[in-house]
From Swiss-Prot:
The gene is pqqB. Transmembrane segments: none annotated. HAMAP family: PQQ_syn_PqqB (MF_00653). This is Coenzyme PQQ synthesis protein B. PANTHER family: COENZYME PQQ SYNTHESIS PROTEIN B (PTHR42663:SF7), HYDROLASE C777.06C-RELATED-RELATED (PTHR42663).
């Protein structure tokens, strides 16, 4: 099984288009300590030929261009991407579907809740049903989005997408709104959880023994955005568990047997973006890798 992290940043990427926080300023200036990152997306294949796209980032065209394995390879119209899987309905995970509208057949897999959120916005009707079949996926049931891959979706604590919020949303519920994906091939297991509000005992059980974990690394501390002066929301309010602190991902998963631990979906205000920073060194000392675009894994 091969996996390519197409986009390793949270919504807006790094640098964000209008941001001059310290990390974005470094990225705008070409400072090598802060690599530019596109928005969250993953590609997985059992054979290097047929690929599953997990989440369709607004940056998907740029990501495909940067990834030769995903280039058209034959005929006038072709794509190695045979299926797309959504883990929630966030803008940074669904907006890229609009780029995939050029009469190219693929299957779109998601829970009923997530499919309904896509169907609720008619702009996604540009994905013509004769080309893009929408397939409902039940939680906790294995399915094969492409031959050779077995995928099981499971609920993780989350919240509704920002664009569907009405009033004060409930945060931390485990429903079909936010899911993780356990992807298996050749006896190896990869877990992809780009959004998670808190680590529960059930989540620890599900992740136990996986060969690779790609996990929500949106914020270092719960109040990253407030400290940076660019926002008022905490990680919890956005539905994201912090990396550090009491109840943070590092501490909560420390005793869980996991092969390789990688943070993805990293917000522009997260100090781990700066290579050789105190925050980066602290995370790496705990056995975690900070993802970058193009990071390729062979399992």
């Amino acid at each position: 099984m091969q996996a390519i992290i197409l986009g390793s940043a949270a919504g807006g990427g790094v640098p964000q288009w209008n941001c001059r926080c310290p990390h974005c300023t470094m990225a705008w200036a070409g400072d090598a300590r802060v690599k530019p990152r596109t928005q969250s997306s993953l590609a997985v294949s059992p054979d290097g030929e047929t690929w599953l796209l997990v989440n369709a980032s607004p940056d998907i065209r740029q990501q495909l261009f940067a990834t030769p394995a995903l280039h058209p390879a034959r005929g006038l119209r072709h794509s190695p991407i045979a299926a797309v899987l959504l883990t929630n309905g966030d803008v940074d995970h669904v907006a890229g579907l609009l780029t995939l509208r050029e009469s190219q057949p693929f299957r779109l897999h998601a829970t009923r809740n997530i499919l309904d959120s896509v169907s609720a916005n008619r702009v996604f009707d540009v994905l013509a049903p004769e080309h893009v079949a929408r397939r409902e996926v039940a939680l906790d049931e294995s399915f094969a989005p492409v031959p050779g891959l077995a995928v099981t979706l499971f609920a993780v604590p989350g919240k509704v997408p920002l664009w569907l919020e009405e009033g004060t949303p409930e945060i931390g519920q485990e429903t079909e709104t936010t899911v993780g994906a356990l992807i298996e091939a050749g006896g190896k297991r990869l877990a992809y959880v780009p959004g998670c509000a808190r680590v529960t005992d059930d989540l620890r059980r599900r992740l136990s023994g996986v060969d690779v974990l790609l996990f929500d690394g949106t914020v270092y501390l719960d109040d990253d955005m407030i400290r940076a002066g660019v926002g008022t929301k905490t990680g919890w309010r956005m539905g994201h568990v912090p990396m550090t602190g009491e109840g943070g991902a590092i501490a909560a998963l420390a005793e869980v047997p996991i092969g390789r631990r990688i943070f993805v979906h990293i917000n522009n205000t997260n100090p781990v973006l700066v290579e050789e920073s105190e925050a980066r060194r602290a995370v790496e000392a705990e056995g975690w890798t900070v993802a970058h675009d193009g990071l390729t894994l062979t399992l």
